């Protein structure tokens, strides 16, 4: 089974993305910016006869007064990956315009914990006002921000993960769902990266070597 880890700031839509991938309302969602996931939760999804374990994680960049302080969320990600028998894909989830904090979050998972051994996707949420979600990535100013912060995903998925009060976004939601599931199937690592192959002390060194 392939492990897929979704990470990002609190309130960016990770849990809604999980529900979209799994095709069931398995993860609790919140309309607030503080996030609703306090610890990692795993859910199974089947994509074209392949089974994936999708990990919803606590939101990063919360203050000490937040549901999960940033330092605790960081350590939770480390402990999650350390206990897995392999990691096949990382998904950086972000709502709209990328902020400076994204650089640290990206570096945390991609470099400090996984040592650039795991492919990484970017999924941009909160695009309900776009005529076509893909238009967001076509704008040079958005691509420029990714380059500025040195975010280099294998692919970018611009989506709508909210059906709407009266299912007004149902059509674009369905297209977004198919898009994300396809990106996972195409870009995941066939031979999962095994964190156990790296000494435990090396993990801690990477985690705190900012």
Label for each model-derived stretch:
Residues 1-210:
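Conserved GTPase G-domain substructure that encodes guanine base recognition and part of the catalytic core
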């Amino acid at each position: 089974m392939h492990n897929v880890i979704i990470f990002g700031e609190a309130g960016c839509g990770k849990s809604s993305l999980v529900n979209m991938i799994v095709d069931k309302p398995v993860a609790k969602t919140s309309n607030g910016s503080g996030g609703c996931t306090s610890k990692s939760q795993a859910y199974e999804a089947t994509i074209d006869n392949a089974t994936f374990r999708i990990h919803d994680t606590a939101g990063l960049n919360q203050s000490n007064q937040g549901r999960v302080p940033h330092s605790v969320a960081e350590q939770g990600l480390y402990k999650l990956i350390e206990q897995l028998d392999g990691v096949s894909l990382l998904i950086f989830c972000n709502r709209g315009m990328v902020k400076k904090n994204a650089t640290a979050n990206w570096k945390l998972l991609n470099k400090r914990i996984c040592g650039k051994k795991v492919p990484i996707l970017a999924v941009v949420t909160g695009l309900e006002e776009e005529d076509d979600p893909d238009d967001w990535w076509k704008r040079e100013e958005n691509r420029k921000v990714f380059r500025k912060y040195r975010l280099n995903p294998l692919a970018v998925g611009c989506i709508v993960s909210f059906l709407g009060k009266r299912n007004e976004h149902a059509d674009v939601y369905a297209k977004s769902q198919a898009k994300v599931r396809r990106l996972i199937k195409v870009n995941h690592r066939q031979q999962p990266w095994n964190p156990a192959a790296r000494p435990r002390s090396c993990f801690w060194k990477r985690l705190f070597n900012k």
